[in-house]
Amino acid sequence: MRNKIPYDSKKILYDSELLLNSASNRYILTMKVANRANLRRYEEFETMNHSSIKPIARTIIEMVDDKNFLVVKKK
């Protein structure tokens, strides 16, 4: 039996495209997302809170919601 996904995959794709389009350097953006997801994963492990959303997807959603993702802007 398939489990229901608690988030919309189309929204994550849209958000990731929004992040990529706003970045002047995709490598730096990719590293920021990966590092933040890695931190979230370890925080989740330490607090024993296990989310059904993978850390990378949660990080993309958080970065778009923060409105601080524009640190790496196009000029």
From Swiss-Prot:
One of its GO terms (cellular component) is DNA-directed RNA polymerase complex. Transmembrane segments: none annotated. One of its GO terms (biological process) is DNA-templated transcription. InterPro entries: DNA-dir_RNA_pol_omega, RPB6/omega-like_sf. Its main location: plastid. SUPFAM superfamilies: RPB6/omega subunit-like. It is found in: Plastid, Chloroplast. The keyword Protein biosynthesis does not apply. Keywords: Chloroplast, DNA-directed RNA polymerase, Nucleotidyltransferase, Plastid, Transcription, Transferase. Coiled coil: none annotated. It catalyses: RNA(n) + a ribonucleoside 5'-triphosphate = RNA(n+1) + diphosphate. GO terms for molecular function: DNA binding; DNA-directed RNA polymerase activity. Its EC number is 2.7.7.6. Belongs to the RNA polymerase subunit omega family. May be involved in RNA polymerase activity. This is Putative DNA-directed RNA polymerase subunit omega. It comes from Mesostigma viride (Green alga).
